Amino acid sequence: MGEMIKFGSGGKTASGYMAIPSPDKARGRGVVVIQEWWGLVDHIKRVADKFALEGFHALAPDLYRGETAGSPDEAEKLLMALNIAEAEKDLRGAVERLRFVTGRPVATVGFCMGGALSLFAACSNPKDVAACVVYYGGHPKVEFDFDGLAAPVLGQWAEDDDFANPNIARFEAELGKRDKAYEFHTYPGTKHAFFNDDRPEVYDRDAAVRSWERTIDHLTRYL
């Protein structure tokens, strides 16, 4: 359904996986899909395809420039080596590309590392991002300009998640004291990455289905 494309990134060129809906389903809405710490792997491409089946134009930028991880140790190294300033340019470029295609503000949706970057991109691009979804997001090097956030945030969290869950109280406090619109859900009995069906040891079908329904509802409401 999708293909790799090139797009502008701060005067340079970035790449990403673009999935386009069929004409009979197209909503004229765009979603930036942001990778887990594994990189732009097949799972993330399938998520972009899944959005296209729902009628959204979806672009998943390749933040690791072609690198992917085969083990948690490799993934952690790639996550920590990520240049946040360069990632910000890639995310802005993806937002701008989708806004050009759709003619309107877009959404950001991210998983794991990408969950933090979804919120980061929404904070950094308030005029261009109208909805934000965070799946169990975290990244130790990302700092958020919460004052700049305009998009309503949907947070999807696992019950058992030492990586991401320390962020829940912080995000709620920062969003709440600024009267930002947000809605958080924690899925009982789940672990980090419960949406990733390539990881049977953590995948939870019921939580994946329910969280996807909430994601689509959120995007439909605000885009």
What positions do the PLM features span?
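Primarily recognizes the serine-hydrolase "nucleophile elbow" in alpha/beta-hydrolase
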Residues: 94-150
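Conserved alpha/beta-hydrolase "acid-adjacent" motif
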Residues: 162-168
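Short beta-to-alpha linker loops that shape the active-site pocket of alpha/beta-hydrolase fold enzymes
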Residues: 63-66, 138, 190
